[in-house]
UniProtKB/Swiss-Prot annotation:
It is found in: Cytoplasm. Belongs to the RNA 3'-terminal cyclase family. Type 1 subfamily. GO terms for molecular function: ATP binding; RNA-3'-phosphate cyclase activity. The gene is rtcA. GO terms for biological process: RNA processing. This is RNA 3'-terminal phosphate cyclase. Catalyzes the conversion of 3'-phosphate to a 2',3'-cyclic phosphodiester at the end of RNA. The mechanism of action of the enzyme occurs in 3 steps: (A) adenylation of the enzyme by ATP; (B) transfer of adenylate to an RNA-N3'P to produce RNA-N3'PP5'A; (C) and attack of the adjacent 2'-hydroxyl on the 3'-phosphorus in the diester linkage to produce the cyclic end product. The biological role of this enzyme is unknown but it is likely to function in some aspects of cellular RNA processing. The keyword Nucleotide-binding applies. Keywords: ATP-binding, Cytoplasm, Ligase, Nucleotide-binding. CDD domains: RNA_Cyclase_Class_II. InterPro entries: RNA3'-term_phos_cycl_insert (IPR013791), RNA3'_phos_cyclase_dom (IPR023797), RNA3'_phos_cyclase_dom_sf (IPR037136), RNA3'_term_phos_cyc (IPR000228), RNA3'_term_phos_cyc_type_1 (IPR017770), RNA3'_term_phos_cycl-like_CS (IPR020719), RNA3'P_cycl/enolpyr_Trfase_a/b (IPR013792), RPTC_insert (IPR036553). Transmembrane segments: none annotated.
Length: 341
């Protein structure tokens, strides 16, 4: 194993730099040190979901890791061989299960055998992709690239209680390049409001706002009332399926935030993407970058250069010999192309 540590600054990009570095380190066998982890955040250092990602990555790659404590702002990680198998990881709070999935999946596609991974914690969190984003937007594109992976939601988990769980099954498989230039024509759209131990009028008001602002018909507006025991919780999901891509925009209901404001947050994201003409929005762009780098090539158009996309590009360049070219096609579209270096 290469013992020359890659040095990373975690002050920019938040936990995204750490997650990408863990994935890339396991894939390449290159160890890294990261300092100033989440230094600009209100709660700097490792939170429980970041620590779970680190300990999970260390377990599946037999890694030596130092700095693995809540609040730690420095970490070193030196991986061994990636080993498939049956794993179970508990975040212990409502920390995001989805972010742990996105850390582990790239490595498990290169494991020595199939894997089954159960993760418990939060499945619908502020500032993290909900389960449905993985299931309907991200993973279908990875499957088109050749990934053999299935994911199942076992139980919803809302902040702050958590208590959710998902299971992922991965068969080792190689990824092929993917090119996404335009989204294609829209062939379906669906707004879903999930509520648990929250007044029913919250879902009704969210959906009414979506229908009014996006001019979606009533049959495209759906409320789902979950078991009160897993609440309180509320999430609004806007799913837009096009020829090439399914996008999913979400907003998490929180105490003191009006239902109409929750709806507006998701609608604003959707409208920005719809009006841009780009193939993918900023979140899907950021999360496609590493799989395309693994595949050795590909391209997509997106709405703009986000902080996460920029920091992810920097991290990938430090681990892989890949050329990433970003071109401003017009004021609404950024084109990103990856090629073997």
């Amino acid at each position: 194993m290469n013992k020359d540590f890659i040095e990373l600054d975690g002050a920019i990009g938040g936990g995204q730099i750490l997650r990408s570095a863990l994935s890339l380190s396991m894939l390449t066998g290159k160890p890294f040190r990261i300092h100033n982890i989440r230094a600009k955040r209100s709660r700097p250092g490792l939170l429980r979901q970041h620590l779970t990602a680190v300990t999970a990555a260390a377990q599946i790659s037999s890694a030596d890791a130092e700095g693995t404590q809540i609040g730690s702002q420095s970490l070193s990680f030196a991986p061994g061989a990636i080993r498939g198998g049956d794993y179970e990881f508990a975040i212990g709070t409502a920390g995001s299960c989805s972010l742990v999935v996105q850390t582990l999946l790239p490595a498990l596609l290169h494991a020595d055998q199939p894997s089954r991974v159960r993760i418990s914690g939060g499945t619908h969190n502020p500032l993290a992709p909900p389960f449905e984003f993985l299931e309907r937007a991200w993973l279908p594109l990875l499957k088109r690239m050749g990934a053999q992976v299935e994911i199942e939601l076992l139980r919803h988990g809302f902040a702050p209680a958590g208590g959710g769980a998902l299971v992922m099954q991965v068969t080792p498989s190689a990824l092929r390049p993917l090119h996404l230039e335009t989204p294609g024509p829209i062939h379906s759209q669906q707004a879903t409001a999930l509520v648990a131990d929250v007044p029913g009028h919250v879902a009704e008001r969210e959906l009414a706002r979506v229908g009014k602002r996006l001019k979606w018909p009533e049959q495209a507006l759906k409320g789902i009332w979950l078991d009160k025991q897993i609440g309180p919780g509320n999430v609004l999901l806007l799913e837009i399926a096009c020829g090439e891509v399914t996008e999913l925009f979400s907003s998490i209901g929180q105490s003191g935030v009006r239902a109409e404001r929750v709806a507006d947050q998701a609608v604003d994201q959707a409208r920005q993407w719809l009006h841009s003409g780009a193939a993918v929005d900023e979140h899907l762009a950021d999360q496609l970058l590493l799989p395309l780098a693994m595949a050795g090539g590909g391209s997509f158009s997106t709405t703009h250069m986000s902080e996460h996309l920029s920091s992810n590009i920097q991290v990938i360049r430090q681990f892989l010999n890949v050329e990433i070219v970003c071109t401003q096609a017009n004021e609404r579209i950024l084109r990103v192309e990856l090629r073997q270096g």
